[in-house]
């Protein structure tokens, strides 16, 4: 998987798109739902970038066998697009319902403009962090992005007995 920064993003192929990635240790499958609470500035910036335009983000699982990318966990190469519902602010947190959608494969990663910092209980604002990189990386983001392509939907049915056997 190739890794780019915001100043050297390649031209996209027709079937590719750039998608913000939310890397977690939990699964979200197509048609699943999960309540989310966001408090980190990088993911607040991500939500600012997508919510107003009704765009999805990519829910991916961190891959512990890979080295970190600019201080961020590298994900496995398959994820699920997420549509956001019931978005609300609660104090300094953003809450929403994540709805799993189409599966995608990550072809390349775009690293964040800054390494994430681990703050105690008081986080800086997104604007304060953007000021740290905006001159060097005007197209940069605090979060990881992926150059992705959609995976075709699965077609057909599987017998329940066979499915249970495969899972056991």
Model region roles, listed by residue range:
Residues 2-168:
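N-terminal low-complexity, acidic/polar interaction/targeting segments
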